[in-house]
Regions:
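Short, basic alpha-helical/linker "hinge" immediately adjacent to a nucleic-acid-recognition surface
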Residues: 3, 7, 18, 27-82
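Mobile-element integrase/transposase regions
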Residues: 72, 83, 103-104, 115-174, ...
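C-terminal, beta-rich DNA-binding module of retroviral/retroelements integrases
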Residues: 284-331
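Residues that mark the N-terminal boundary/hinge immediately upstream of a DNA-recognition element
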Residues: 25-26, 89
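Short, charged, surface-exposed loops that flank catalytic or proteolytic processing sites
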Residues: 147, 263-278
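RNase H-like two-metal-ion nuclease catalytic core shared by retroviral integrases
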Residues: 68, 205-208, 216-231, 235-259, ...
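Mobile genetic element proteins and their domesticated derivatives, centered on retroelements
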Residues: 16, 30, 41-44, 52, ...
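Basic, flexible linker segments flanking DNA-binding modules
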Residues: 52-146, 151-152, 298-309
Length: 331
C-alpha cells in the first residue's frame, strides 16, 4: 500500500475504525466519539476492509465544490464592483449588487474577492475600551439623541456642510435629518420644528454641551435659544458628559459617513437642497428599515402639539429682547 495523506480529522477516524474492525472497540462507542450514526460507522468499516486507509479519505478531496461560483460569473460581478463600488465595503456592495443589479452573493464571498483584487484590506480587530451599554428607553419618543456632523458629505463635488440628525433611543430610527451649511441654532430649531410637526413632542432631547444647548458664560443662568424653545414645548433637555454617553447618534454618523456619502454620489447629488429632498423621500425610510429595531413597549411617548402652526414657528424662531427709546426707536 502506498503513502496515504490524511487530515487530522481523517487520522482520528482511521484510528477508531481500525480498532472497531479489530474488535477492540464497539460501533456505538466509535459513533459517539466521531459524532456519527452507527450506520455510518458500519459503512466506514466496510470501506476500510475493502480499501484500507484509502477508503476513509473524503471522496470530495481535490474536487471543486458544487457551490463554487463560475469564473465568468465572478468576472462579471467584479467588473460591476470595479466600475461602481470600488471603495465600498463587502456588506454595502452586496446590498447594491442585489438592489441595483439583481445579483445575490454572500458578503463573505465578496470580501474574499475584494481582498484578492486589492479593493479591501482585512481589518485587525483591536481591543476596545469598555463602555457599559446604557439600556434603551422602552418607548419611542421618550428620548431623542441629537447631534450635528460637519463632513465632506458631497466629497469633492461641493463644499463641506453639516448634517443634523435626531435619532430615537428606543428604536434607533432616524426621526429627522437635514443638511445645513453650518451647525447653528437656527438649523437645530428648524429640525426641532419639523420633528414636532411630524411626530409630536418627545419627552426629552439628549445632546452634547455645544453652545447651541448650554450657556457657557459664567453665572449665566438664562437658557439658550434652543433651551428656551424646549422649555416652551415642555421638552426636557439633557446634556451628555461624554461622546460615549450618546453613542447611538455617534454611531449613526459613522454609518452615514460611510453609506450616505456613497448613496449621494451614486444618485448624482451635489447640493444641499437636493440632498435634503433625497433624505426625506428615499434615504431615511430605507435606513430605518435596515437598522431600526422595535421598541420594547409599543406605546409612542410623543405628545401631540396643541398649538397652531404659527405658534410653533414663533417658538422655534430666534427671540431677542428689544426696547424703545424716548423717540420710539427700537433698540
Amino acid at each position: 500500500m502506498g503513502l496515504v495523506q490524511m487530515s487530522s480529522k481523517e487520522l482520528e477516524r482511521y484510528a477508531l475504525i481500525r480498532r472497531v474492525v479489530g474488535k477492540e472497540l464497539g460501533q456505538s462507542f466509535a459513533a459517539a466519539q466521531l459524532g456519527l450514526s452507527v450506520r455510518q460507522i458500519k459503512r466506514l468499516c466496510a470501506a476500510y476492509r475493502a480499501q484500507g486507509a484509502q477508503g476513509l479519505i473524503s471522496k470530495q478531496r481535490g474536487r471543486a465544490s458544487n457551490r463554487q461560483t463560475k469564473p465568468n460569473t465572478r468576472s462579471r460581478i467584479m467588473a460591476l464592483v470595479h466600475t461602481h463600488y470600488s471603495d465600498f465595503g463587502p456588506t454595502l456592495a452586496c446590498e447594491y449588487l442585489q438592489s441595483q443589479h439583481g445579483v445575490t452573493l454572500s458578503s463573505e464571498t465578496l470580501r474574499q474577492w475584494l481582498i484578492a483584487d486589492g479593493l479591501w484590506k482585512p481589518r485587525v480587530r483591536r481591543a476596545k475600551r469598555a463602555h457599559p451599554s446604557r439600556e434603551r428607553r422602552p418607548c419611542a419618543g421618550e428620548l431623542i439623541q441629537i447631534d450635528g456632523s460637519p463632513h465632506a458629505w458631497f466629497e469633492d463635488r461641493a463644499p463641506n456642510c453639516t448634517l443634523i440628525a435626531f435619532i430615537d433611543d428606543a428604536t434607533s430610527k432616524v426621526m429627522g435629518a437635514r443638511f445645513y451649511p453650518t451647525e447653528t441654532t437656527v438649523a437645530y430649531l428648524d429640525v426641532l420644528e419639523r420633528h414636532v410637526r411630524q411626530h409630536g413632542r418627545p419627552v426629552s432631547l439628549y445632546s452634547d454641551r455645544h453652545g447651541v444647548f448650554t450657556n457657557h458664560k459664567e453665572s449665566a443662568n438664562t437658557p439658550t435659544q434652543f433651551g428656551r424653545a424646549c422649555l416652551q414645548l415642555e421638552i426636557e433637555s439633557i446634556l451628555a458628559l461624554s461622546p460615549q454617553a450618546k453613542g447611538r447618534v455617534e454611531r449613526l454618523f459613522q454609518t452615514l459617513q460611510n453609506r450616505l456619502v456613497k448613496a449621494l454620489r451614486l444618485a448624482g447629488i451635489s447640493d444641499i437642497e437636493s440632498a435634503n429632498r433625497y433624505l426625506e423621500e428615499t434615504y431615511i425610510a430605507a435606513h430605518n428599515k435596515r437598522f431600526g429595531v422595535e421598541a420594547h413597549n409599543p406605546q409612542d411617548a410623543h405628545r401631540a402639539y396643541a398649538g397652531t402652526d404659527v405658534d410653533l414657528k414663533r417658538i422655534c424662531a430666534l427671540h431677542h429682547k428689544r426696547q424703545y427709546s424716548s423717540t420710539l426707536a427700537c433698540q
